[in-house]
From Swiss-Prot:
Protein's recorded name: Cytochrome b
InterPro entries listed in its UniProt record: Cyt_b/b6_C (IPR005798), Cyt_b/b6_C_sf (IPR036150), Cyt_b/b6_N (IPR005797), Cytb/b6-like_sf (IPR027387), Cytochrome_b (IPR030689), Cytochrome_b_C_euk/bac (IPR048260), Cytochrome_b_N_euk/bac (IPR048259), Di-haem_cyt_TM (IPR016174)
Quaternary structure and partners: The cytochrome bc1 complex contains 11 subunits: 3 respiratory subunits (MT-CYB, CYC1 and UQCRFS1), 2 core proteins (UQCRC1 and UQCRC2) and 6 low-molecular weight proteins (UQCRH/QCR6, UQCRB/QCR7, UQCRQ/QCR8, UQCR10/QCR9, UQCR11/QCR10 and a cleavage product of UQCRFS1). This cytochrome bc1 complex then forms a dimer.
Keyword line: Electron transport, Heme, Iron, Membrane, Metal-binding, Mitochondrion, Mitochondrion inner membrane, Respiratory chain, Transmembrane, Transmembrane helix, Transport, Ubiquinone
Cofactor note: Binds 2 heme b groups non-covalently.
Protein species of origin: Ctenomys sociabilis
GO aspect biological process, one term: mitochondrial electron transport, ubiquinol to cytochrome c
Length: 379
């Protein structure tokens, strides 16, 4: 009699994905982030579900309902802050996961990579709509500013914005639909994650050397299951430390003031994980130009497989490309810092320089350096 794990139609899928999956023997801790993102997604859906049980998507009661969750619901404060800080963890891991993909050339798996970029867009949309739900000052003004960007689309822009708002300004209709979308999107994301994994398991995982690892594979369980559990342990320690000691560290104090359409906050800015894109948006004085730069700053990820010009897949043995990679990381950190600063003299120029450098590094410096490395290696 065959093992049920290998014969049962449903369990067989799980077995081929997480148990008997042949994995390269040399994948490092950088390969932990995929599973961590899965855990984060599960955690967000679970905490979000419990929050939705007590939240009311109405402009008059939304803010009070969040206060009620924190004060009156059993461990409501814990659920709320796990959800808010869980989103931050989610994005930290997302950026690490993408960075790993760029460094080790994982973008060569075109299908997996492109679904991944679409996943990034979906997660960003979900996070943006979630930030609107507490209906604080930054929620309201963030929603107003970001949705207004669509008015830059020629001809249909203004109509499109009013259609999204469900009226002539951000109001009750907007909040209700944002809640509906924020609830449904994580399930769509889960389906996309399954497709992401389906494509990945067609090719098998990449590894730090970037070379074919068919000759040296080990079963996913127990080797990488135990490694992933260790990663989850570190993640939970970090998340719970944030939640228990400094739950508002990554939030904005303005969001503790109920939304007031008659009073604009002095500095409208998104959550920290969007600041780099916000800095790129602000660095262009033209509205449509800024919106295009914002979209392209993420969409540019789809060009990586096309721009790859090295004979080697990974950057492990390419010191010049490594320098550029870390330059890009530093550049993104500078953009993140600038995104949180007011639009004043030194910051405007720094933001514009960092934005130009971001696109220049990816589109010109990285491919040309890879070609130079080929020449140096006489390839």
């Amino acid at each position: 009699m065959t093992n049920m794990r290998k014969s049962h139609p449903l369990i067989k899928i799980v077995n081929h994905s997480f148990i008997d999956l042949p994995a390269p023997s040399n994948i490092s801790a950088w390969w932990n982030f995929g599973s961590l993102l899965g855990v984060c997604l599960g955690l967000q859906i679970l905490t979000g579900l419990f929050l939705a049980m007590h939240y009311t998507a109405d402009t008059t009661t939304a803010f009070s309902s969040v206060t009620h969750i924190c004060r009156d619901v059993n461990y409501g404060w814990l659920i709320r802050y796990m959800h808010a800080n869980g989103a931050s963890m989610f994005f930290i891991f997302l950026y690490f996961h993408i960075g790993r993909g760029i460094y080790y050339g994982s973008y060569s798996f075109m299908n997996t990579w492109n679904i991944g970029v679409l996943l990034l867009f979906a997660v960003m949309a979900t996070a943006f709509m979630g930030y609107v739900l507490p209906w604080g000052q930054m929620s309201f003004w963030g929603a107003t500013v970001i949705t207004n960007l669509l008015s830059a689309i020629p001809y249909i822009g203004p109509t499109l914005v009013e259609w999204i708002w469900g009226g002539f300004s951000v109001d009750k209709a907007t909040l209700t639909r944002f809640f509906a979308f924020h609830f449904i999107l994580p399930f769509i994301i889960t389906a996309m994650v399954m497709i992401h994994l389906l494509f990945l398991h067609e090719t098998g995982s990449n590894n730090p050397s970037g070379m074919n690892s068919d000759s040296d594979k080990i079963p996913f369980h127990p080797y990488y299951t135990i490694k992933d559990i260790l990663g989850v342990l570190f993640m939970m320690i970090t998340l719970m430390s944030l939640v228990m000691f400094t739950p508002d560290l990554l939030g904005d104090p303005d969001n503790y003031t109920p939304a007031n359409p008659l009073n604009t906050p002095p500095h409208i800015k998104p959550e920290w994980y969007f600041l780099f894109a916000y800095a790129i948006l602000r660095s262009i004085p033209n509205k449509l130009g800024g919106v295009l730069a914002l979209v392209f700053s993420i969409l540019i990820l789809m060009l990586f497989p096309i721009l790859h010009s090295s004979k080697q897949r990974s950057m492990s043995f390419r010191p010049l490309s490594q320098c550029l990679m870390w330059m890009l990381v530093a550049n993104l950190l500078i953009l993140t810092w600038i995104g949180g600063q007011p639009v004043e003299h030194p910051f405007i120029t720094i933001g514009q320089l960092a934005s130009v450098t971001y696109f220049f590094t990816i589109l010109i410096l990285m491919p040309s350096t890879a070609l130079m490395e080929n020449k140096l290696l006489k390839w």
